[in-house]
Structures are given as C-alpha cells and as structure tokens.
Amino acid sequence: IPYEKIGIDVAAARIESYDDKSRKPTEVIYTDLKGDLFRRDFTINAMAVDILPESFGELHDPFSGILDLQAKQITTPLDPDETFGEDPLRMLRAAYFASQFGFEIDKKGYDSIVRQKDRILIVSQERITAELFKILASPKPSIGLVILQETGLMKLIFPEIDIMYGIDQTPEWHHKDIFFHTMQVVDNAAKLTEKMEIRFAALVHDIAKPITRRVDQKKGYTFHGHDAIGEKMLDKVAQRMKLSNNLGTYLKKMTLLHLRPIALAKKGVTDSAVRRLMVAASDETDDLMTLCRADITTKNSKKVKKYMQNFERVDELMKNVQERD
C-alpha cells in the first residue's frame, strides 16, 4: 500500500511448515500476532507496534527483542536449529546483521549455524548472492565475511575465498594470511567508497593467490601470474554466482589490472606507462585507483605514506595526460 513516500507491505499473520529438502513452505496456517512473530528470523525483528486508535503505539515484544537490541545481540525467537532449518538463508542474514550493526550472534545461534551450514545448499544461488551483496555493502564487511568463514558457510558458497585462510604471504608486504589481508582490503575499500562493485573487486582481487603460490629462496613466497589467472577464474565464479555480465566483466578487469598502478607507484611513473594504464582501465580507471589504495595493508607507516604519495603522482599524471590528449 503506498503511503506518502513509502510503501507498506500488508500480510496476514501466519505460521509456515517446511520439510528438510526445501525452503518452500509445505503448509501455511493463519494465526494471531504472537504466532506470526514466533516465525520471524530474529527477536529484533519479532516486534510489532499497534496501529489501532485505542492502543496506538503499544509495543508487542513477546521475545524480548528490545533487550537483544540494546545488548546488540542476534538471537532467534525459536530454537535456532528450527529457525535456520526453516529458511537457511537466515544464517547469511545473521552474518549480515553482524556486519551492518556491529552485533554479535549468540552462542546457541552460532553453534546452530555450524551444525546447519549444509542446508544453505537448498537455497537458490540468486538469494545467496543477494545476501552476500548486502554484507559487502555494510560498514565493515569483514565482520560478516569472517563469520561465514569460521562457521564453514564460506566453503560452501565461495570456496575460492575460503581456501585463502591459513595461506601465508611474504610478511614484508602483507599480513601473513591471504584471507585476513583480503578482509583488510575489503574494509579499506568500504571506508573509501560505497560502490559495491569496488568492494566486490577487493574481495576477489587476489583470488588466484592460493593456486599460484611458490617458494623463492630469496624472496619467500611468490604469486606470479595471480592477476591473469585470477581474471580467468572469475569466469566460472561469475557463472556460478549468477552475476550480471557487466559485473563479471568489471571484476575480471579489476583483478587483471590491480597490480599495474602498484608497479608504477614502486618504480616511478612515466607518461607512456600512465597512458597504457588508462587505455587498459578505460572508464574504470578511478575505481582501479581506489582498489589499489585499499590494497595497501602494510603496517609500515613510511611505506604507506610513500605509496600514497606515488598514487597521487599517478593521479596527477593521468589528469595531465588526459588534458594533453
């Protein structure tokens, strides 16, 4: 129902029953308000406000959702095994709420996600991808992404990210663990931009590092070709995750090019090198530079300052080249 500038959804109070192999209800029973709130995902969403004139504004909170809201806790009205069993997507939604609001999943719910994780496979890929987008759009995406990894959900919905966990990098340049380096890059990107596409690119930019890691006796670990191999890997990822063609192409380009500005920043910048980069990146040049800034995760403040200054030089040269061309 349209009301002023918003739309109001109207639905009858109901209880739904499910079987073990589908998230579609096998039976719908119409019920009262408490019965309807009983089937909600979390107690913080199981509250209602009366709009009848004689009791307008009265809060109905049968499961102490207000207390959980104040405690910043994600709790289910029912036993979490039942709640997550009915609609397994709620497990991803719990991770999203944790990322979006900085809340914590209560222990019973967390343990239930670990037990129920395999049921996520009955959910359509489109719904899973949409929930992942929400996590990436949150203020600190790493919170939800780490929950997915620790509970075992990441292995099921995004195995290419899961295998990053526990794989060391050369400490001089990055955090030792590729997974946690990636989490830092995603969070850095979230601070720099609200654009979900850049945040997604931050998540996948090192996707090929686990399969390209080699040992160099002088340099430690190397990941030669992880940019080009990562670009190829993203074809299958985009297809599996039902990404749009535009997003898939964008992620491939950002992954392929993400080392180019970093290389320029390390070695110094020439007009011809900048021009080649601009041609390759095309309309995504600014996005690529944002990703590269996010990719600076070293704790060495002198190196951070140096790279940032060099990126500023790259930006300035791009403007100069663009004006002359």
Model feature map: region roles:
Residues 1-325:
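Catalytic cores of the polymerase beta-like nucleotidyltransferase superfamily
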